[in-house]
From Swiss-Prot:
Covalent S-S links between cysteines: none
Matches recorded under InterPro entries: PCD_sf (IPR036428), Pterin-4-alpha-carb_dehyd (IPR050376), Pterin_deHydtase (IPR001533)
Protein name: Putative pterin-4-alpha-carbinolamine dehydratase
Keyword list, A-Z: Lyase
Length: 112
């Protein structure tokens, strides 16, 4: 699914459906540089971004924070010298929801 960045997140509740394995594979094709990890039994999308210095990494982190506020969906952002790691997952669903893939695709667009 290559148009994920054009979609808008929907309200996610505790009973929101997690993506199926088939949906996961399909949506991963649109965000090929992301990987699925499992932390504390919860699937998450993770990607590391590298930069030439801390200031560029910091600026990118701020763009992700603005994206998160606009979508009302919030990731874990780890800022280091020359590197930002972003993890998306749906806290209320305790796993991966379509919102996570939408935000991952929009995160990739923040590099442009």
């Amino acid at each position: 699914m290559s148009n994920l960045h054009e979609l808008k997140c929907e309200a996610c509740h505790i009973d929101a459906p997690k993506v199926t394995d088939l949906e996961l594979e399909e949506m991963l094709q649109g965000i090929s540089q992301w990987r699925v990890i499992e932390r504390d039994g919860i699937k998450q999308l993770e990607r590391e971004f590298t930069f030439k210095n801390f200031k560029l990494a910091w600026a990118f982190s701020n763009k992700i924070a603005e994206l998160a506020e606009a979508e009302f969906h919030h990731p874990t952002i780890t800022l280091e010298w020359g590197k930002v790691t972003v993890c998306w997952w749906s806290h209320s669903a305790k796993g991966l929801h379509k919102n996570d893939f939408i935000c991952a695709a929009k995160t990739d667009r923040c590099l442009e």
